[in-house]
């Protein structure tokens, strides 16, 4: 049986995760409470990724191995409470994607200077000859780069 992943949110993070999960053999369902961009829907259709927009249908989420919640979606909404009560693990894009790569990860966090620090670190490593990516709030989503 194929593992199912539900992705809440079809923005940059959700889109990248959906494509990566599909490439790794997951049954993917993307649910977005807002309209999904036409180009994204066309891409999902081409890849065989099921999706819905303007709603979240709980019955379509049951049986999922994971639910990846995009960072822009609050954890304090009834849908998240319901998914937790069904004991479906909620994961972030970073958590899900890190399971599918052997790459060494460097995370840069904090209140100030993250973009500058990330760009400088990327430049130093690239100049030193390492095969590096710059992902997150700069560049592509992590999932898209993997």
Question: What residue ranges belong to the model's regions?
Answer:
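N-terminal leader/targeting and accessory segments in enzymes
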Residues: 1-92, 96
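Phosphate-binding loop of NTP-binding sites
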Residues: 20-23, 58-62, 71-146
């Amino acid at each position: 049986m194929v593992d199912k992943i539900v992705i809440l949110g079809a923005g940059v993070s959700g889109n990248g995760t959906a494509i990566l999960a599909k490439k790794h053999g997951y049954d993917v369902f993307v649910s977005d409470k807002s309209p999904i961009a036409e180009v994204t829907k066309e891409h999902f259709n081409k890849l065989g990724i099921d999706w819905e927009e303007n709603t979240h249908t709980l019955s379509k989420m049951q049986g999922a191995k994971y639910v990846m919640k995009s960072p822009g979606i609050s954890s304090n909404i009834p849908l998240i409470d319901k998914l937790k009560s069904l004991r479906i693990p909620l994961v972030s894009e970073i958590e899900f994607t890190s399971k599918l790569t052997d790459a060494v990860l460097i995370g840069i966090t904090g209140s100030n200077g993250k973009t500058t620090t990330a760009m400088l670190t990327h430049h130093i490593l690239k100049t030193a000859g390492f095969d590096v990516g710059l992902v997150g709030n700069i560049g592509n989503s992590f999932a898209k780069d993997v």
